[in-house]
């Protein structure tokens, strides 16, 4: 009997599927290219995008607010960090795209950057945003500190004799009678080499007050007697500037009336006279 024909056993050639680390057998990694834009498959970690679109918002004399755009694609980050001068100043949840900073100085520029965080990783920092606190009115400035005061006689100088009768410079000090902000001021200093003290009340940017002081002498130096004059002072603040977190006066001017009464002794006398002076204060 003839032997049966011999035929090879049929075997299906197996297809080897490449397994990607971290994914189960049968999973397929897909990178779709649509209209030239790469779209990551949902099982791949979404890229952590740099925050963009920073814009200034509402500002007050002591605070600023700014905001930025949502991520262009993918989920929001876990949170955002806010930095100024390289230092962390705050953080918000990843669903929040605005931030307010308080306790700032008035009329001052500040710079901020934002970074996104997810899974312990941080995105590149955003572009720098410069924001400015609002400038208060001059009337809100606190008048304080030492001042160099330029005094010029604009009327009545003929009643005086000696050098410097047309004008001179004195040193005055303004001491507010409140812990912060503008208020009544005690003014101290010298006038014609004699001390003066005056209390000036405030009305907006204008301060007014009266005082008496012995600033002139009647008679020759050997037997002169003091003249007790009445000083009427009016000061108007002309500028302000930040000092720390306060808003303080940076310049002022005004005028002072000096009314000297008739003064006499048993051997001589001085007629009454009045002077009108201009005042200008600077640091």
Regions of interest found by a model, annotated:
Residues 253-283:
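Edge beta-strand at a domain terminus
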Residues 138-164, 186-191, 207-211, 252-257:
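Tryptophan-anchored aromatic micro-motifs
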Residues 11-45:
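Hydrophobic single-pass membrane-targeting/anchoring helices
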Residues 78-82:
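Short beta-strand elements bearing conserved aromatic residues within extracellular beta-rich modules
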Residues 164-239:
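Predominantly extracellular/secreted and cell-surface proteins with exposed
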Residues 101-121:
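Beta-strand-rich modules
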Residues 95-99:
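Short S/T/G- and acidic-enriched coil/turn segments that sit immediately N-terminal to beta-strands
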Residues 42-76, 106, 121-136:
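Pro/Thr/Ser/Gly-rich low-complexity, intrinsically disordered linker/stalk tracts
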